[in-house]
Amino acid sequence: RSFPPEIGGMQNLMGGLANALLNHGPVKVFADKFEGSDVYDQSLKLEIERFGGIKLLRKYRKANRLNDFIKSNQNIRSIFFDHWKSIEKINDKVIEKIPTFCLIHSKEINHPLGSSLNKRVINSFKKIKFIIANSNFTKKLGIEIGLPKEKIYVIHPGCEEPIEVEKEYELKAEKIYQDSFPKIITVARLDRRKNHQNILMCIRNLKEIFPKIKYVSVGDGE
């Protein structure tokens, strides 16, 4: 569901994970088509199979293809899923002997207990051996909505190795921050659900302790 060149936090995380796993052997990726994905895929050492078309049909086609692929490849060492919906249509018998992992973050599992979506989430995760939460907050939420505590592990999202910053951007950053302290930056869409308003309230309170604090938010939105 989430993979570059589409822009987003989960996309970056899954792209980074796939590339990092190349250090341990060949990696096969099943992902949705996206504008520019053909060119992007050619630049990588990953074997990537893309799926286009209507979203609902794509979900079934991808699951059927993955089920067939697993059945015909007995040397699969592990499988990583980015979302519970990616697991939902997978045959549990096909993956029962394979170490399986699925990432969770609060938004996609936060459904009322006993609701239809909550039941779908729980049934999907029954097929998975390891549930990877991006924070202790998400782990706690997972337990509250009915996921088994013993399956959930917290691994904070990683990042790429630092790149060399071009002088042009270094000067731009210096102009923005000047002599401010502390310097804080976030990269996120400016959506209300991301609670930027609460961060701004915190910054306002911190300004009494750190009068030169500067907070920069980078992202599209309203």
Annotated model-derived regions:
Residues K167-K183, E208-I209:
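Nucleotide-sugar donor-binding and catalytic loop/hinge architecture
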Residues K33, F137, G158:
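Carbohydrate-associated surface elements
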Residues P112-L113, I143, G158-K175:
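Acidic anion/phosphate-binding donor-loop and adjacent secondary structure
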Residues R1-I7, L13-R58, G221:
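N-terminal strand-loop element at the rim of the active site
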Residues E6, L57, I87-E88, T100-S116, ...:
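A short, histidine- and acid-enriched strand-loop-helix "catalytic/donor-clamping" loop
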Residues I176-K194, L200-I203, V216:
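Conserved donor-binding/catalytic core segment of Leloir-type glycosyltransferases
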Residues F81-I87:
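Short His-centered aromatic/hydrophobic patch
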